[in-house]
Protein backbone atom coordinates (compact mmCIF):
# COMPACT_ATOMS: atom_id res chain seq x y z
CA UNK A 1 0.00 0.00 0.00
CA UNK A 2 1.21 3.51 -0.80
CA UNK A 3 2.37 5.85 1.91
CA UNK A 4 0.05 8.84 1.53
CA UNK A 5 2.46 11.16 3.41
CA UNK A 6 5.53 10.61 1.17
CA UNK A 7 7.48 13.58 -0.23
CA UNK A 8 6.57 12.69 -3.77
CA UNK A 9 2.90 12.77 -2.94
CA UNK A 10 3.25 16.07 -1.06
CA UNK A 11 4.85 17.67 -4.08
CA UNK A 12 2.16 16.37 -6.38
CA UNK A 13 -0.47 18.08 -4.28
CA UNK A 14 0.99 21.51 -5.09
CA UNK A 15 -0.76 21.71 -8.43
CA UNK A 16 -4.44 21.20 -9.18
CA UNK A 17 -3.81 18.91 -12.14
CA UNK A 18 -1.47 16.71 -10.15
CA UNK A 19 -3.98 16.55 -7.31
CA UNK A 20 -6.77 15.44 -9.62
CA UNK A 21 -4.59 12.78 -11.22
CA UNK A 22 -3.54 11.53 -7.81
CA UNK A 23 -7.15 11.12 -6.68
CA UNK A 24 -8.09 9.29 -9.88
CA UNK A 25 -5.12 6.88 -9.85
CA UNK A 26 -4.77 6.30 -6.12
CA UNK A 27 -7.78 7.00 -3.94
CA UNK A 28 -10.58 6.28 -6.44
CA UNK A 29 -9.25 3.69 -8.87
CA UNK A 30 -12.74 2.89 -10.23
CA UNK A 31 -12.88 6.38 -11.70
CA UNK A 32 -10.25 5.39 -14.24
CA UNK A 33 -11.70 7.16 -17.26
CA UNK A 34 -10.39 10.51 -18.42
CA UNK A 35 -12.14 13.64 -17.27
CA UNK A 36 -13.69 14.43 -20.62
CA UNK A 37 -15.08 10.89 -20.87
CA UNK A 38 -16.58 10.82 -17.39
CA UNK A 39 -20.40 10.57 -17.62
CA UNK A 40 -21.54 13.61 -15.70
CA UNK A 41 -25.05 13.41 -14.28
CA UNK A 42 -27.36 15.84 -16.00
CA UNK A 43 -28.98 18.40 -13.81
CA UNK A 44 -32.74 18.12 -13.71
CA UNK A 45 -35.10 20.77 -12.54
CA UNK A 46 -37.40 19.43 -9.84
CA UNK A 47 -41.02 19.87 -10.82
CA UNK A 48 -43.26 21.61 -8.36
CA UNK A 49 -45.87 19.33 -6.83
CA UNK A 50 -49.35 19.55 -8.21
CA UNK A 51 -52.43 19.73 -6.08
CA UNK A 52 -54.57 16.78 -7.14
CA UNK A 53 -58.29 16.67 -6.59
CA UNK A 54 -59.23 13.27 -5.10
CA UNK A 55 -62.89 14.22 -4.72
CA UNK A 56 -64.24 11.81 -7.29
CA UNK A 57 -67.38 9.75 -7.36
CA UNK A 58 -67.18 5.99 -6.91
CA UNK A 59 -69.40 5.78 -9.98
CA UNK A 60 -66.73 7.42 -12.18
CA UNK A 61 -63.30 6.09 -13.28
CA UNK A 62 -60.38 7.30 -11.16
CA UNK A 63 -58.65 10.16 -13.09
CA UNK A 64 -56.17 12.39 -11.27
CA UNK A 65 -54.65 14.43 -14.14
CA UNK A 66 -54.41 14.57 -17.89
CA UNK A 67 -51.03 12.85 -18.09
CA UNK A 68 -50.75 9.27 -19.30
CA UNK A 69 -49.17 8.21 -16.04
CA UNK A 70 -52.15 9.39 -14.05
CA UNK A 71 -54.59 7.44 -16.19
CA UNK A 72 -53.43 4.21 -14.58
CA UNK A 73 -55.20 2.76 -11.54
CA UNK A 74 -53.86 3.68 -8.09
CA UNK A 75 -50.96 1.48 -7.00
CA UNK A 76 -52.24 1.20 -3.43
CA UNK A 77 -55.67 0.67 -1.87
CA UNK A 78 -54.64 3.25 0.75
CA UNK A 79 -54.93 5.89 -1.96
CA UNK A 80 -58.53 4.92 -2.54
CA UNK A 81 -59.25 5.32 1.16
CA UNK A 82 -58.35 9.03 0.86
CA UNK A 83 -61.19 9.64 -1.54
CA UNK A 84 -64.72 10.47 -0.55
CA UNK A 85 -67.98 10.19 -2.38
CA UNK A 86 -69.73 13.25 -3.73
CA UNK A 87 -72.42 14.01 -1.22
CA UNK A 88 -72.76 13.17 2.44
CA UNK A 89 -71.59 9.55 2.71
CA UNK A 90 -67.87 8.70 2.77
CA UNK A 91 -66.33 5.80 0.88
CA UNK A 92 -66.77 2.57 2.84
CA UNK A 93 -63.71 0.55 3.72
CA UNK A 94 -63.45 -2.65 1.77
CA UNK A 95 -61.76 -5.97 2.21
CA UNK A 96 -58.33 -6.50 0.76
CA UNK A 97 -59.89 -8.45 -2.08
CA UNK A 98 -59.70 -6.18 -5.17
CA UNK A 99 -62.63 -5.33 -7.34
CA UNK A 100 -62.60 -7.48 -10.52
CA UNK A 101 -60.44 -6.09 -13.30
CA UNK A 102 -63.24 -6.37 -15.85
CA UNK A 103 -65.14 -3.59 -14.13
CA UNK A 104 -64.29 0.00 -14.98
CA UNK A 105 -66.22 1.42 -12.04
CA UNK A 106 -65.53 1.15 -8.33
CA UNK A 107 -68.78 0.04 -6.72
CA UNK A 108 -69.85 -0.02 -3.09
CA UNK A 109 -70.84 -3.24 -1.34
CA UNK A 110 -74.56 -2.51 -1.53
CA UNK A 111 -74.56 -1.62 -5.23
CA UNK A 112 -72.39 -4.62 -6.16
CA UNK A 113 -74.42 -7.16 -4.18
CA UNK A 114 -77.70 -5.54 -5.22
CA UNK A 115 -76.72 -5.69 -8.88
CA UNK A 116 -75.72 -9.34 -8.51
CA UNK A 117 -79.07 -10.20 -6.90
CA UNK A 118 -81.07 -8.33 -9.54
CA UNK A 119 -79.32 -10.08 -12.44
CA UNK A 120 -78.80 -13.46 -10.74
CA UNK A 121 -79.69 -16.74 -12.43
CA UNK A 122 -78.85 -20.13 -10.80
CA UNK A 123 -75.95 -21.94 -12.42
CA UNK A 124 -75.94 -25.75 -12.62
CA UNK A 125 -72.44 -25.84 -14.12
CA UNK A 126 -70.28 -28.17 -12.04
CA UNK A 127 -67.23 -26.39 -10.57
CA UNK A 128 -63.93 -28.04 -9.79
CA UNK A 129 -63.94 -30.50 -6.86
CA UNK A 130 -63.17 -29.15 -3.40
CA UNK A 131 -61.14 -30.70 -0.62
CA UNK A 132 -63.48 -32.11 2.05
CA UNK A 133 -63.06 -30.66 5.53
CA UNK A 134 -64.76 -31.73 8.73
CA UNK A 135 -66.52 -29.33 11.10
CA UNK A 136 -65.64 -29.45 14.79
CA UNK A 137 -68.62 -30.10 17.06
CA UNK A 138 -68.29 -27.88 20.14
CA UNK A 139 -71.39 -29.41 21.68
CA UNK A 140 -74.80 -30.27 20.19
CA UNK A 141 -74.23 -28.49 16.87
CA UNK A 142 -74.10 -31.60 14.67
CA UNK A 143 -77.40 -30.45 13.12
CA UNK A 144 -75.74 -27.22 11.95
CA UNK A 145 -72.59 -28.99 10.76
CA UNK A 146 -74.60 -31.42 8.62
CA UNK A 147 -76.69 -28.66 7.03
CA UNK A 148 -73.63 -26.50 6.27
CA UNK A 149 -71.87 -29.45 4.62
CA UNK A 150 -74.94 -30.20 2.49
CA UNK A 151 -75.12 -26.55 1.37
CA UNK A 152 -71.40 -26.36 0.55
CA UNK A 153 -71.75 -29.37 -1.76
CA UNK A 154 -74.89 -28.00 -3.44
CA UNK A 155 -73.66 -26.90 -6.88
CA UNK A 156 -75.95 -23.86 -7.49
CA UNK A 157 -75.46 -22.62 -3.92
CA UNK A 158 -71.68 -23.06 -4.06
CA UNK A 159 -71.59 -21.25 -7.40
CA UNK A 160 -73.55 -18.39 -5.82
CA UNK A 161 -71.02 -18.05 -2.98
CA UNK A 162 -68.17 -18.21 -5.47
CA UNK A 163 -69.80 -15.47 -7.55
CA UNK A 164 -70.21 -13.24 -4.49
CA UNK A 165 -66.58 -13.81 -3.52
CA UNK A 166 -65.47 -12.81 -7.00
CA UNK A 167 -67.69 -9.78 -7.57
CA UNK A 168 -68.61 -8.24 -4.21
CA UNK A 169 -66.11 -6.49 -1.89
CA UNK A 170 -66.15 -7.32 1.80
CA UNK A 171 -68.58 -5.33 3.94
CA UNK A 172 -67.15 -4.22 7.27
CA UNK A 173 -70.53 -2.90 8.43
CA UNK A 174 -71.93 -6.45 8.73
CA UNK A 175 -75.30 -5.60 7.20
CA UNK A 176 -75.54 -9.13 5.76
CA UNK A 177 -73.83 -11.31 8.39
CA UNK A 178 -75.02 -14.71 7.14
CA UNK A 179 -74.15 -14.01 3.50
CA UNK A 180 -70.69 -12.78 4.46
CA UNK A 181 -70.07 -15.68 6.86
CA UNK A 182 -70.93 -18.28 4.22
CA UNK A 183 -68.76 -16.64 1.56
CA UNK A 184 -65.87 -16.60 4.04
CA UNK A 185 -66.51 -20.23 4.99
CA UNK A 186 -66.47 -21.25 1.32
CA UNK A 187 -62.92 -19.88 1.02
CA UNK A 188 -61.77 -22.57 3.46
CA UNK A 189 -62.61 -25.23 0.87
CA UNK A 190 -59.79 -25.36 -1.67
CA UNK A 191 -60.57 -26.30 -5.25
CA UNK A 192 -58.55 -28.97 -7.04
CA UNK A 193 -57.95 -29.50 -10.72
CA UNK A 194 -56.97 -33.14 -10.14
CA UNK A 195 -58.45 -35.96 -8.11
CA UNK A 196 -57.34 -36.13 -4.48
CA UNK A 197 -57.72 -38.51 -1.57
CA UNK A 198 -56.61 -36.68 1.55
CA UNK A 199 -59.02 -34.47 3.44
CA UNK A 200 -58.15 -31.06 4.79
CA UNK A 201 -57.82 -30.20 8.46
CA UNK A 202 -61.05 -29.97 10.41
CA UNK A 203 -62.26 -26.45 11.09
CA UNK A 204 -64.67 -24.80 13.47
CA UNK A 205 -67.41 -22.93 11.58
CA UNK A 206 -66.95 -20.05 14.01
CA UNK A 207 -67.60 -17.45 11.32
CA UNK A 208 -71.15 -18.78 10.80
CA UNK A 209 -71.70 -19.32 14.51
CA UNK A 210 -70.72 -15.70 15.23
CA UNK A 211 -73.04 -14.42 12.50
CA UNK A 212 -76.03 -15.94 14.29
CA UNK A 213 -75.30 -14.27 17.63
CA UNK A 214 -77.94 -11.78 18.66
CA UNK A 215 -80.47 -13.19 16.19
CA UNK A 216 -83.48 -14.60 18.10
CA UNK A 217 -84.05 -17.16 15.35
CA UNK A 218 -80.85 -18.95 16.36
CA UNK A 219 -81.17 -18.75 20.12
CA UNK A 220 -80.71 -22.52 20.39
CA UNK A 221 -77.11 -22.15 19.15
CA UNK A 222 -76.29 -19.84 22.06
CA UNK A 223 -77.91 -22.04 24.71
CA UNK A 224 -76.26 -25.25 23.48
CA UNK A 225 -79.57 -27.03 22.92
CA UNK A 226 -79.95 -29.74 20.30
CA UNK A 227 -82.05 -28.60 17.34
CA UNK A 228 -83.95 -30.30 14.55
CA UNK A 229 -81.87 -30.15 11.35
CA UNK A 230 -84.89 -29.47 9.13
CA UNK A 231 -86.05 -26.64 11.37
CA UNK A 232 -82.57 -25.12 11.38
CA UNK A 233 -82.40 -25.40 7.58
CA UNK A 234 -85.68 -23.50 7.23
CA UNK A 235 -84.60 -20.76 9.65
CA UNK A 236 -81.21 -20.47 7.99
CA UNK A 237 -82.58 -20.20 4.45
CA UNK A 238 -85.28 -17.76 5.60
CA UNK A 239 -82.69 -15.46 7.16
CA UNK A 240 -80.47 -15.66 4.08
CA UNK A 241 -83.50 -14.89 1.92
CA UNK A 242 -84.33 -11.79 3.95
CA UNK A 243 -80.75 -10.50 3.79
CA UNK A 244 -80.77 -10.82 0.01
CA UNK A 245 -84.19 -9.15 -0.19
CA UNK A 246 -83.02 -6.17 1.90
CA UNK A 247 -79.97 -5.64 -0.31
CA UNK A 248 -82.07 -5.91 -3.47
CA UNK A 249 -84.56 -3.35 -2.16
CA UNK A 250 -81.73 -0.98 -1.26
CA UNK A 251 -80.27 -1.37 -4.74
CA UNK A 252 -83.60 -0.74 -6.49
CA UNK A 253 -84.43 2.28 -4.36
CA UNK A 254 -80.96 3.69 -4.89
CA UNK A 255 -81.42 3.40 -8.63
CA UNK A 256 -84.87 5.04 -8.54
CA UNK A 257 -86.62 1.88 -9.63
CA UNK A 258 -89.91 0.54 -8.37
CA UNK A 259 -90.32 -0.41 -4.75
CA UNK A 260 -90.71 -4.21 -4.46
CA UNK A 261 -93.88 -5.61 -2.97
CA UNK A 262 -93.97 -6.59 0.67
CA UNK A 263 -91.81 -9.52 1.62
CA UNK A 264 -93.43 -12.81 2.63
CA UNK A 265 -91.26 -15.37 4.38
CA UNK A 266 -91.18 -18.66 2.56
CA UNK A 267 -91.82 -20.88 5.55
CA UNK A 268 -94.55 -18.64 6.94
CA UNK A 269 -96.07 -18.05 3.51
CA UNK A 270 -97.11 -21.67 3.25
CA UNK A 271 -98.79 -21.63 6.64
CA UNK A 272 -100.62 -18.37 6.06
CA UNK A 273 -101.84 -19.68 2.72
CA UNK A 274 -103.37 -22.78 4.26
CA UNK A 275 -104.98 -20.77 7.04
CA UNK A 276 -106.69 -18.57 4.47
CA UNK A 277 -108.88 -21.53 3.48
CA UNK A 278 -110.72 -21.36 6.79
CA UNK A 279 -114.06 -20.58 5.20
CA UNK A 280 -115.59 -19.85 1.83
CA UNK A 281 -116.14 -16.15 2.50
CA UNK A 282 -112.42 -15.56 3.08
CA UNK A 283 -111.62 -17.41 -0.13
CA UNK A 284 -113.88 -15.18 -2.21
CA UNK A 285 -112.67 -11.98 -0.54
CA UNK A 286 -109.66 -11.60 -2.80
CA UNK A 287 -108.02 -13.21 -5.80
CA UNK A 288 -108.67 -13.57 -9.50
CA UNK A 289 -110.81 -15.84 -11.65
CA UNK A 290 -109.48 -18.76 -13.69
CA UNK A 291 -111.25 -21.15 -16.03
CA UNK A 292 -111.06 -24.60 -14.52
CA UNK A 293 -112.21 -28.05 -15.51
CA UNK A 294 -115.25 -28.12 -17.85
CA UNK A 295 -114.81 -24.33 -18.28
CA UNK A 296 -116.01 -23.80 -14.73
CA UNK A 297 -114.74 -20.52 -13.22
CA UNK A 298 -112.49 -20.79 -10.18
CA UNK A 299 -111.12 -18.21 -7.74
CA UNK A 300 -107.32 -18.15 -7.75
CA UNK A 301 -104.98 -16.45 -5.29
CA UNK A 302 -101.26 -16.58 -4.70
CA UNK A 303 -99.05 -16.32 -1.61
CA UNK A 304 -96.12 -14.66 -3.33
CA UNK A 305 -92.49 -14.59 -2.25
CA UNK A 306 -90.17 -11.76 -3.16
CA UNK A 307 -87.41 -12.93 -5.47
CA UNK A 308 -83.94 -13.68 -4.11
CA UNK A 309 -81.15 -16.14 -4.98
CA UNK A 310 -82.46 -18.40 -2.19
CA UNK A 311 -85.98 -18.57 -3.61
CA UNK A 312 -84.54 -19.01 -7.11
CA UNK A 313 -82.43 -22.00 -6.01
CA UNK A 314 -84.63 -23.75 -3.45
CA UNK A 315 -88.16 -22.37 -3.86
CA UNK A 316 -90.98 -24.24 -5.61
CA UNK A 317 -94.73 -23.75 -5.81
CA UNK A 318 -97.76 -25.89 -4.96
CA UNK A 319 -101.30 -25.52 -6.26
CA UNK A 320 -103.98 -26.21 -3.67
CA UNK A 321 -107.55 -26.56 -4.96
CA UNK A 322 -110.55 -26.39 -2.65
CA UNK A 323 -113.87 -27.77 -3.90
CA UNK A 324 -117.04 -26.89 -2.00
CA UNK A 325 -120.51 -28.05 -3.16
CA UNK A 326 -122.56 -25.31 -4.88
CA UNK A 327 -119.58 -22.95 -4.96
CA UNK A 328 -116.80 -22.05 -7.31
CA UNK A 329 -113.51 -23.90 -6.89
CA UNK A 330 -110.79 -21.95 -5.11
CA UNK A 331 -107.12 -22.19 -6.04
CA UNK A 332 -104.21 -21.07 -3.90
CA UNK A 333 -100.62 -21.03 -5.18
CA UNK A 334 -98.30 -21.65 -2.24
CA UNK A 335 -94.50 -21.55 -2.02
CA UNK A 336 -92.56 -24.45 -0.52
CA UNK A 337 -89.03 -24.87 0.70
CA UNK A 338 -88.38 -27.71 1.36
CA UNK A 339 -91.15 -30.05 0.18
CA UNK A 340 -92.74 -31.82 3.15
CA UNK A 341 -93.49 -35.52 2.56
CA UNK A 342 -95.74 -37.43 4.94
CA UNK A 343 -94.58 -41.06 5.25
CA UNK A 344 -96.93 -42.32 8.00
CA UNK A 345 -99.41 -44.17 5.76
CA UNK A 346 -98.81 -47.91 5.54
CA UNK A 347 -98.72 -47.92 1.74
CA UNK A 348 -95.84 -45.40 1.54
CA UNK A 349 -92.48 -47.12 1.03
CA UNK A 350 -90.66 -44.75 -1.33
CA UNK A 351 -90.27 -41.10 -2.25
CA UNK A 352 -92.53 -41.66 -5.28
CA UNK A 353 -95.22 -43.14 -3.01
CA UNK A 354 -94.99 -40.08 -0.75
CA UNK A 355 -95.27 -37.67 -3.70
CA UNK A 356 -98.36 -39.43 -5.05
CA UNK A 357 -99.88 -39.58 -1.56
CA UNK A 358 -99.38 -35.81 -1.24
CA UNK A 359 -101.56 -35.23 -4.31
CA UNK A 360 -104.41 -37.50 -3.19
CA UNK A 361 -107.71 -35.68 -2.44
CA UNK A 362 -108.24 -34.79 1.22
CA UNK A 363 -111.79 -35.00 2.61
CA UNK A 364 -112.81 -32.05 4.79
CA UNK A 365 -116.03 -32.94 6.67
CA UNK A 366 -118.12 -30.28 8.38
CA UNK A 367 -116.73 -27.53 6.16
CA UNK A 368 -118.41 -24.23 7.02
CA UNK A 369 -119.93 -22.47 4.01
CA UNK A 370 -122.65 -19.91 3.34
CA UNK A 371 -125.12 -22.80 3.03
CA UNK A 372 -124.12 -24.48 6.27
CA UNK A 373 -121.70 -27.29 7.02
CA UNK A 374 -120.82 -29.39 3.98
CA UNK A 375 -118.20 -31.94 2.98
CA UNK A 376 -115.45 -30.30 0.94
CA UNK A 377 -112.31 -31.68 -0.68
CA UNK A 378 -108.85 -30.23 -1.00
CA UNK A 379 -106.22 -31.47 -3.44
CA UNK A 380 -102.57 -30.50 -3.71
CA UNK A 381 -100.45 -30.54 -6.87
CA UNK A 382 -96.96 -29.40 -7.75
CA UNK A 383 -97.07 -26.24 -9.87
CA UNK A 384 -93.32 -25.67 -10.29
CA UNK A 385 -90.07 -27.23 -9.08
CA UNK A 386 -86.80 -25.48 -8.13
CA UNK A 387 -83.27 -26.23 -9.39
CA UNK A 388 -82.52 -27.80 -5.99
CA UNK A 389 -85.37 -29.90 -4.61
CA UNK A 390 -85.10 -30.60 -0.87
CA UNK A 391 -87.38 -33.39 0.35
CA UNK A 392 -88.18 -33.58 4.05
CA UNK A 393 -89.20 -37.08 5.14
CA UNK A 394 -91.43 -36.36 8.13
CA UNK A 395 -90.01 -38.91 10.57
CA UNK A 396 -91.53 -37.49 13.74
CA UNK A 397 -95.21 -37.56 14.67
CA UNK A 398 -97.22 -36.94 17.80
CA UNK A 399 -99.31 -39.44 19.72
CA UNK A 400 -101.54 -38.45 22.60
CA UNK A 401 -100.42 -41.46 24.62
CA UNK A 402 -96.68 -41.42 23.98
CA UNK A 403 -95.93 -37.89 22.81
CA UNK A 404 -93.54 -37.31 19.92
CA UNK A 405 -92.46 -40.54 18.23
CA UNK A 406 -89.97 -41.39 15.50
CA UNK A 407 -90.88 -43.41 12.40
CA UNK A 408 -88.05 -45.80 11.49
CA UNK A 409 -89.75 -47.02 8.32
CA UNK A 410 -87.28 -47.57 5.44
CA UNK A 411 -88.07 -45.18 2.59
CA UNK A 412 -86.55 -45.91 -0.82
CA UNK A 413 -85.01 -42.95 -2.64
CA UNK A 414 -83.18 -43.26 -5.97
CA UNK A 415 -79.92 -41.66 -7.03
CA UNK A 416 -81.79 -40.36 -10.09
CA UNK A 417 -85.31 -39.14 -9.45
CA UNK A 418 -87.91 -38.78 -12.21
CA UNK A 419 -90.98 -36.91 -10.99
CA UNK A 420 -94.20 -38.65 -12.17
CA UNK A 421 -96.54 -36.51 -14.26
CA UNK A 422 -99.62 -37.23 -12.13
CA UNK A 423 -98.24 -35.15 -9.23
CA UNK A 424 -98.21 -31.96 -11.35
CA UNK A 425 -101.19 -29.66 -11.67
CA UNK A 426 -103.25 -30.15 -14.86
CA UNK A 427 -102.18 -26.73 -16.13
CA UNK A 428 -98.50 -27.76 -16.41
CA UNK A 429 -98.81 -31.53 -16.74
CA UNK A 430 -97.01 -32.84 -19.81
CA UNK A 431 -95.07 -29.62 -20.42
CA UNK A 432 -92.22 -30.37 -18.00
CA UNK A 433 -90.26 -33.57 -17.46
CA UNK A 434 -87.87 -32.84 -14.60
CA UNK A 435 -85.16 -35.27 -13.58
CA UNK A 436 -82.99 -34.85 -10.51
CA UNK A 437 -79.71 -36.27 -9.23
CA UNK A 438 -79.21 -36.97 -5.54
CA UNK A 439 -76.33 -34.89 -4.13
CA UNK A 440 -76.75 -34.97 -0.33
CA UNK A 441 -78.55 -36.97 2.37
CA UNK A 442 -78.87 -35.79 5.98
CA UNK A 443 -79.43 -38.65 8.46
CA UNK A 444 -80.88 -38.69 11.95
CA UNK A 445 -79.59 -41.15 14.55
CA UNK A 446 -81.39 -41.93 17.79
CA UNK A 447 -84.95 -42.04 19.06
CA UNK A 448 -85.64 -38.50 20.26
CA UNK A 449 -86.83 -35.62 18.13
CA UNK A 450 -85.06 -33.15 20.43
CA UNK A 451 -81.84 -35.15 20.61
CA UNK A 452 -79.90 -37.84 18.80
CA UNK A 453 -77.22 -37.17 16.24
CA UNK A 454 -76.98 -35.94 12.63
CA UNK A 455 -74.59 -36.99 9.87
CA UNK A 456 -74.53 -36.34 6.13
CA UNK A 457 -73.47 -37.96 2.86
CA UNK A 458 -72.43 -35.49 0.15
CA UNK A 459 -71.50 -35.89 -3.49
CA UNK A 460 -68.37 -34.17 -4.76
CA UNK A 461 -69.19 -31.07 -6.82
CA UNK A 462 -67.96 -32.66 -10.05
CA UNK A 463 -69.85 -35.91 -9.24
CA UNK A 464 -66.58 -37.83 -8.93
CA UNK A 465 -67.55 -39.58 -5.70
CA UNK A 466 -69.32 -39.49 -2.34
CA UNK A 467 -68.16 -38.68 1.20
CA UNK A 468 -69.72 -39.68 4.51
CA UNK A 469 -69.22 -36.88 7.04
CA UNK A 470 -69.76 -37.24 10.78
CA UNK A 471 -68.55 -33.90 12.18
CA UNK A 472 -64.75 -34.33 11.81
CA UNK A 473 -64.80 -37.93 10.54
CA UNK A 474 -64.79 -38.24 6.74
CA UNK A 475 -64.43 -41.27 4.49
CA UNK A 476 -65.37 -42.20 0.95
CA UNK A 477 -68.47 -44.30 0.28
CA UNK A 478 -69.78 -45.88 -2.94
CA UNK A 479 -73.06 -44.67 -4.36
CA UNK A 480 -74.85 -47.95 -3.55
CA UNK A 481 -74.17 -47.29 0.16
CA UNK A 482 -75.88 -43.90 -0.20
CA UNK A 483 -78.87 -44.88 -2.29
CA UNK A 484 -81.47 -46.48 0.02
CA UNK A 485 -78.70 -46.48 2.61
CA UNK A 486 -81.03 -46.98 5.58
CA UNK A 487 -81.88 -50.40 4.10
CA UNK A 488 -78.27 -51.59 4.26
CA UNK A 489 -76.07 -52.42 7.22
CA UNK A 490 -73.00 -50.23 7.61
CA UNK A 491 -70.32 -51.65 9.96
CA UNK A 492 -68.82 -48.19 10.50
CA UNK A 493 -72.10 -46.97 11.98
CA UNK A 494 -72.18 -49.83 14.47
CA UNK A 495 -68.70 -48.88 15.68
CA UNK A 496 -69.85 -45.29 16.16
CA UNK A 497 -72.95 -46.42 18.00
CA UNK A 498 -75.35 -45.03 15.37
CA UNK A 499 -77.06 -48.19 14.15
CA UNK A 500 -80.49 -46.53 14.01
CA UNK A 501 -79.72 -44.12 11.20
CA UNK A 502 -82.54 -43.07 8.86
CA UNK A 503 -82.63 -40.60 5.97
CA UNK A 504 -84.23 -37.32 7.03
CA UNK A 505 -83.45 -34.70 4.34
CA UNK A 506 -82.78 -35.44 0.67
CA UNK A 507 -81.07 -32.86 -1.57
CA UNK A 508 -81.74 -33.32 -5.29
CA UNK A 509 -80.26 -31.12 -8.04
CA UNK A 510 -81.99 -30.83 -11.39
CA UNK A 511 -80.11 -32.39 -14.27
CA UNK A 512 -78.74 -29.70 -16.58
UniProtKB/Swiss-Prot annotation:
<dbReference type="GO" id="GO:0031647">
    <property type="term" value="P:regulation of protein stability"/>
</dbReference>
<keyword id="KW-0788">Thiol protease</keyword>
<dbReference type="GO" id="GO:0140492">
    <property type="term" value="F:metal-dependent deubiquitinase activity"/>
</dbReference>
<dbReference type="GO" id="GO:0005829">
    <property type="term" value="C:cytosol"/>
</dbReference>
<dbReference type="GO" id="GO:0004843">
    <property type="term" value="F:cysteine-type deubiquitinase activity"/>
</dbReference>
<feature type="active site" description="Proton acceptor">
    <location>
        <position position="453"/>
    </location>
</feature>
<dbReference type="GO" id="GO:0005737">
    <property type="term" value="C:cytoplasm"/>
</dbReference>
<protein>
    <recommendedName>
        <fullName>Probable ubiquitin carboxyl-terminal hydrolase 3</fullName>
        <ecNumber>3.4.19.12</ecNumber>
    </recommendedName>
</protein>
<dbReference type="GO" id="GO:2000156">
    <property type="term" value="P:regulation of retrograde vesicle-mediated transport, Golgi to ER"/>
</dbReference>
<dbReference type="GO" id="GO:0016579">
    <property type="term" value="P:protein deubiquitination"/>
</dbReference>
<keyword id="KW-0378">Hydrolase</keyword>
<dbReference type="InterPro" id="IPR018200">
    <property type="entry name" value="USP_CS"/>
</dbReference>
<dbReference type="GO" id="GO:0071629">
    <property type="term" value="P:cytoplasm protein quality control by the ubiquitin-proteasome system"/>
</dbReference>
<dbReference type="InterPro" id="IPR050164">
    <property type="entry name" value="Peptidase_C19"/>
</dbReference>
<keyword id="KW-0833">Ubl conjugation pathway</keyword>
<dbReference type="GO" id="GO:0005634">
    <property type="term" value="C:nucleus"/>
</dbReference>
<keyword id="KW-0645">Protease</keyword>
<dbReference type="Pfam" id="PF00443">
    <property type="entry name" value="UCH"/>
</dbReference>
<feature type="region of interest" description="Disordered">
    <location>
        <begin position="64"/>
        <end position="109"/>
    </location>
</feature>
<dbReference type="InterPro" id="IPR028889">
    <property type="entry name" value="USP_dom"/>
</dbReference>
<comment type="similarity">
    <text>Belongs to the peptidase C19 family.</text>
</comment>
<dbReference type="InterPro" id="IPR001394">
    <property type="entry name" value="Peptidase_C19_UCH"/>
</dbReference>
<feature type="domain" description="USP">
    <location>
        <begin position="133"/>
        <end position="511"/>
    </location>
</feature>
<dbReference type="InterPro" id="IPR038765">
    <property type="entry name" value="Papain-like_cys_pep_sf"/>
</dbReference>
<feature type="active site" description="Nucleophile">
    <location>
        <position position="142"/>
    </location>
</feature>
<dbReference type="GO" id="GO:0010494">
    <property type="term" value="C:cytoplasmic stress granule"/>
</dbReference>
